[in-house]
Amino acid sequence: MTYLTRRTALQAIAATGTSFIGITEALANALSLATSASSNDDEFWFTVRQAYAIDPTIVNLNNGGVAPSPRSVQDALRRATERANEIPAYEMWRNQEPQIETVRQRLATMFGVDQEEIAITRNASEALETVQLGYRLRAGDEVVTTTQDYPRMLTTWEQRERRDGIVVKRVKYPTPLVNSDDFVDAVVSAITPQTKVVHISHIVFLTGQILPVQSICRIARERGILSIVDGAHSFAHIPFRRADLDCDVFATSLHKWLSAPIGTGMLYVRKDLIPSIWPLMAAPKTMDADIRKFEEIGTHPAAVHNAIGDAITFHQ
């Protein structure tokens, strides 16, 4: 994964084939701007801005919670939804549902993993809770996380604390974090022989602090501890792949920085760990080692997850 460049962004916009600025000729002009040494950032980003249908009367400074989808993604979602409503069962299950495999492969390529390690979810919370609630823990087992992790995820661990008698340790660290070694030392010092899980954010949701997750994950691996990384705010935002984190589990919301449809997320689980995690909703025993067991949620709109592919095209 790389940072957005002028050329790749505009090529992606042009490739969508939509009329978001009314004239296709304007796209060709924009492409020439991208390669011109005299073009300035304002011209380029104005063109990118036209790809989005945004209320001009409001300056939206919060794209971290839910980002808008470009018109190309909205159009793809709309067309597929309309088609699914014309012949629902046939279109949804025979035509649209199988396309999730193409999306799975493209996400796996972006993250640098095997497609059999990627599940498509509705958001990062669902993806993380799948593992938080599905991983086998006994009374007395410890989970190490931080006070600055996402509240919903902390609430999930607290529920397991009440329900199963596990122990949740919340590491405090300063904001801003000046020395990454201080963070690593703080987390490692909380680890004991009873620690079974370490759960940390890649980018802190409130501050934007990027944490040294690779160091933590490698230490966890050496000690036989499951490492969970909350990447809700990092995927498609900063350049990295799974190898840069070395985590066992990674989850993100695709409706944030990737600009995929609202209600899309991704879960990565290292292949050999899949059998050890129960899905949130029941799946047959034959799927015990299949990443798709985490997608067994009943009837859902296939058009939504298929439009993730259009978001990837735009992003790249």
Label the predicted regions.
Residues 2, 8-316:
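Pyridoxal 5′-phosphate
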